[in-house]
């Protein structure tokens, strides 16, 4: 039996990174082999691609270029880090995966979800998460959180106007409906302690 692949999705400021940092020690304490990682990134090549994608000055980046860079980073991360961990029966907690591309590039950028999905099917060879937690939050609330977080670097996507971030959320909600068999929507506009408790319960009920 292979490991379990859990992805955490959500718009900017939804609390994904903070949530994963809390989930990691919880499952480690339960003697679970667990690994946390992120997209784009997780390994050297993909972190370099992340730097390119997030550079504020690269406002000229075209939507298809953006989609292909995310897919390239995803492929390398998958084969170099995620798949080996799953083969070793780890619980892998990943900050973003394919659903981000569907919401951001497929819907918000207007490339079409089906086209972006096919690009990523090629990149992932149909390796899909066992479970996805989607942290839902109003764009205004998420962006306000980012502004208050002095330790978080503002990236190119953060700088998009509010209409873009609203489209991202609309895209995510369509993705949730399309893949309702593996995606669970959780309200992210609640205290982090309650959010952690809810997500832990979902993971344990569905997978462990």
Curated annotation (Swiss-Prot):
Record's protein name? Thymidylate kinase
Q: Quote the Pfam families the UniProt record gives.
A: Thymidylate_kin
Q: Which reaction does it catalyse?
A: dTMP + ATP = dTDP + ADP
- Broad class of enzyme this protein falls into: transferase
A GO term (biological process) for this protein?
A: dUDP biosynthetic process
Q: What SUPFAM superfamilies does the database record attribute to this sequence?
A: P-loop containing nucleoside triphosphate hydrolases (SSF52540)
Could you say which EC number(s) this protein's record lists?
2.7.4.9
Q: Which GO terms describe its cellular component?
A: cytosol
Record HAMAP family? Thymidylate_kinase (MF_00165)
Q: Which residues bind ATP?
A: 10-17
- Role of this protein: Phosphorylation of dTMP to form dTDP in both de novo and salvage pathways of dTTP synthesis.
Which CDD domains does this entry report, sorted A to Z?
TMPK
Provide the family line: Belongs to the thymidylate kinase family.
Source taxonomy: Bacteria, Bacillati, Bacillota, Bacilli, Bacillales
The species is Bacillus cereus (strain B4264)
Task: Give an example GO molecular function.
Answer: dTMP kinase activity
Q: Sorted alphabetically, which InterPro entries does this protein's record hold? A: P-loop_NTPase, Thymidylate_kin-like_dom, Thymidylate_kin_CS, Thymidylate_kinase
Keyword tags = ATP-binding, Kinase, Nucleotide biosynthesis, Nucleotide-binding, Transferase
């Amino acid at each position: 039996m292979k490991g379990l692949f859990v992805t955490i999705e959500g718009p900017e400021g939804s609390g994904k990174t903070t949530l994963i940092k809390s989930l990691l020690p919880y499952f480690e304490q339960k003697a679970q082999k667990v690994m946390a990682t992120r997209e784009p990134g997780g390994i050297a090549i993909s972190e370099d691609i992340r730097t390119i994608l997030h550079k504020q000055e690269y406002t000229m980046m075209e939507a298809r270029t953006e989609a292909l860079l995310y897919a390239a980073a995803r492929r390398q991360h998958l084969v170099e880090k995620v798949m080996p961990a799953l083969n070793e029966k780890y619980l892998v907690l990943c900050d973003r995966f394919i659903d981000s591309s569907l919401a951001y590039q497929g819907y918000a950028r207007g490339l079409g979800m089906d086209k972006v999905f096919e690009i990523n099917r090629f990149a992932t060879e149909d390796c899909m998460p066992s479970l996805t937690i989607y942290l839902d939050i109003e764009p205004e609330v998420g962006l306000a959180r980012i502004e208050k977080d002095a330790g978080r670097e503002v990236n190119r996507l953060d700088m998009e106007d509010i209409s873009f971030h609203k489209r991202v959320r609309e895209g995510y909600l369509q993705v949730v409906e399309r893949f309702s068999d593996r995606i669970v929507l959780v309200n992210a506009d609640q205290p982090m302690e309650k959010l952690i408790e809810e997500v832990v319960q979902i993971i344990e009920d569905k997978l462990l």
